[in-house]
Amino acid sequence: MWVHRVALVFLLCASSADAQDWPQFRGPTGQGHSDERGVPLNWSEQNNIAWKVPVPGAGWSSPVVAGGRVWMTTAVPEARGALSLRAIAFDAQTGREVVNVEAARVDRPGYAHFKNGRASPTPVIAGDRVYVHFGADGTAALTTSGEVVWRARYRYDSQHGSGGTPIVYGDLLIFNCDGNYQEAFVVALDTRTGKQRWKTQRRQPADQAYTTPLVIRVGERDQLISIGAYRAYAYDPMTGKEIWRVSYDDGFSNVPRPVYGHGLVFIATGFQQPTLIAVRADGQGDVTRTHIAWTLTRGAPFTPSPILVGDELYVVNDTGILTTVDARTGTIHYQQRLGGNYSASPVFADGRIYFQSEEGVTTVIPPGRQFGRLATNRLDGATLASMAIAGAAIFIRSDSHLYRIQAAR
């Protein structure tokens, strides 16, 4: 079975999203999987483009799809260097812009990494609410028609701009706040009011990280997997109380979202010496010496998240080397250079895995222990955001446009 128990946590606790929706970063399960069929294999600027529309401003938040709308965030420059941080939505069938509303504002934006910016976190849709997040610049809840319900802001020194995306768990909106100079914590807000329900400080030392949490089910208990600098944590998602933690010495500025399957949490340790570690999720306290099942250093990613399909884990690193390993043992099946540079996380749909480079090129492969290339598809512009899949269509955000890609009928 492709989708592991992590799928049930989101589907039961977060929203009533149907199979056509892609309501959060990395889809319904948060693992990059789609149940759609008829998803296009081939496309180009001249082929299988249902529509292509310009996107105002700048941002690398990935598209999410629910209720017939495609949502993203963007940062629009204004006078004297200010930025209007906006939520935008397009009609999924026509590409017509239907919402464009200011959710937050920055009068004096500081430095942001060229691969990041002020509109990198992906929206999350749950029920009749859309939650948009801009890191230390603020968080907001909107109605699906674009009315702002509440705003909140947690200040911390996010050196390279915004990054990690929130998640919805029941009536909680949870996100990481990992900044420089030991400012690092995780916070849960009431989805209805924006009021704080819990806040948990990271252990020291701490540093910057830009990750998205994941809720998994282990035995009879849910765990909030939250990746920070130097350590990854499992918390009780209702209270923020720590369940277990694992340490890694040289890891910070983490980006990939964790992946879960076969009882293992797959964690990318971040900058300096990128390493992928597989941690058994049934521990208590400090599990560094007891629960690491295997590690991978050759080909480990710094930015793209891994994807688990069956018994194989697929990781593409930032320089385009694809590594496929046995998920249980870490044994490498093959390594293959795809070409290009990578920030977007891969997706699995219709029996195929899609890897999208920063240069607008998507390589499509079959799952398995041997490499095969099914298609190579090219679009104009840069593509650092991850694709979304809904309604048998692929939605791709470039640095200037949003595409709906669909096989001709």
What are these regions (language model features)?
Residues 17-409:
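Noncatalytic, solvent-exposed loop/strand surfaces
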Residues 4-15:
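Bacterial N-terminal signal peptides
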